[in-house]
């Protein structure tokens, strides 16, 4: 057989692909993982049964030098770790095949002490933070002023500006991720049996939540909290009046464009950045900062962490705690309340 190393390597990749297919992982996830393994193979110019821990260290240094985010490095490490795990699993024959054909066997080269996941609990940038209440209000005021300006000037785009303003408010009022927001359909507006006066604006059924482990998108219902009931009139106006003026026809998307299509994620990012800059807010604030703001503000309102975790769809409570960044005013209120209870308790004991 010509170049047996190449044929065995390709067979390994094909076998790993089939294993992931059988687990129901998304095709895009599988392609991304295979691409990482091929890239590592090309970088080392070695076949898997020749890989070493030092190869991973050098590869990591290379991608970090190219200013890759820590989350990207972690994804690379995870892909390599899972591939090596597959090769060294005794349920498969790769160890026996390699020993028989090449007198070497694959080994796990991604270990706890040379991977990002072991070193870093939080991989976000230190400059990322939630918006304060004042910044949220400033952002929404600027978005609303866009609508008024376009209406008063007689220029086109007022309906689109109204849609954009309500979309940003929805991201904040429900703590949504970007994809979760743009993939909403009109049918995803739901009632809250406890607050019938809100009609179908009491909850959102999120069908495109972040997938776990490369599987299908998860689903959850996010309840509107009373502190954000200001969201209802604007949403009612969009759904019952403004949206129909885009002539969506049979299109089920909640957020439609002038061309009768669903809004894109890229558009939402760009529009947030434009409105943020118009509002003279810090450039390090991103659309995802609104989701961080939601978690922080619900915590300051006094909601239980478990409730907040369910609302935002976090698998682990630790992720929710990372999102939270309570204000100094909130900390002072909590401290004042604790001191008051302590003083009252001491006076009662006298």
Q: What does each of the following model-derived ranges do?
A:
Residues 1-350:
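Conserved catalytic core of the tyrosine transesterase superfamily
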């Amino acid at each position: 057989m010509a170049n047996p190393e190449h044929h065995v390597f390709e067979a390994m990749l094909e076998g790993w692909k089939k294993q992931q297919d059988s687990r129901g992982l998304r095709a895009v996830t599988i392609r991304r993982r295979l691409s990482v393994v091929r890239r590592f193979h090309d970088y080392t110019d070695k076949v898997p049964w020749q890989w070493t821990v030092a190869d991973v260290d050098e590869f990591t240094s290379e991608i970090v030098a190219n200013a890759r985010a820590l989350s990207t490095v972690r994804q690379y490490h995870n892909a390599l770790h899972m591939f090596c795990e597959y090769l060294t699993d005794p349920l498969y024959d790769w160890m026996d095949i390699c020993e028989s054909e090449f007198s070497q066997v694959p080994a796990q080269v991604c270990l706890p002490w040379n991977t990002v996941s072991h070193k870093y609990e939080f991989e976000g940038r230190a400059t990322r933070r939630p918006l304060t209440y004042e910044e949220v209000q400033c952002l929404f005021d600027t978005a609303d002023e866009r609508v008024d300006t376009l209406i008063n000037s007689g220029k086109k785009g007022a309906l689109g500006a109204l849609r954009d303003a309500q979309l940003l408010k929805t991201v904040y009022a429900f703590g949504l991720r970007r994809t979760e927001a743009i993939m909403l359909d009109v049918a995803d507006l739901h009632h809250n049996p406890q607050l019938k006066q809100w009609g179908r604006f009491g909850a959102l059924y999120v069908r495109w939540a972040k997938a776990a482990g490369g599987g299908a998108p998860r689903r959850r219902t996010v309840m509107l909290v009373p502190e954000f009931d200001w969201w209802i009139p604007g949403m009612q106006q969009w759904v019952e009046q403004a949206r129909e003026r885009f002539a969506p026809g049979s299109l089920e998307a909640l957020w439609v464009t002038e061309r009768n299509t669903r809004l894109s994620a890229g558009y939402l990012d760009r529009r947030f950045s434009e409105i943020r800059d118009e509002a003279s807010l810090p450039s390090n604030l991103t659309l995802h900062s609104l989701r961080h703001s939601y978690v922080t503000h619900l915590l300051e309102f006094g909601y239980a962490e478990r409730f907040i975790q369910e609302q935002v769809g976090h698998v682990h409570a630790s992720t929710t705690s990372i999102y939270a960044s309570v204000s100094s005013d909130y900390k002072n209120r909590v401290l004042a309340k604790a001191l008051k209870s302590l003083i009252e308790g001491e006076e009662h004991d006298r």
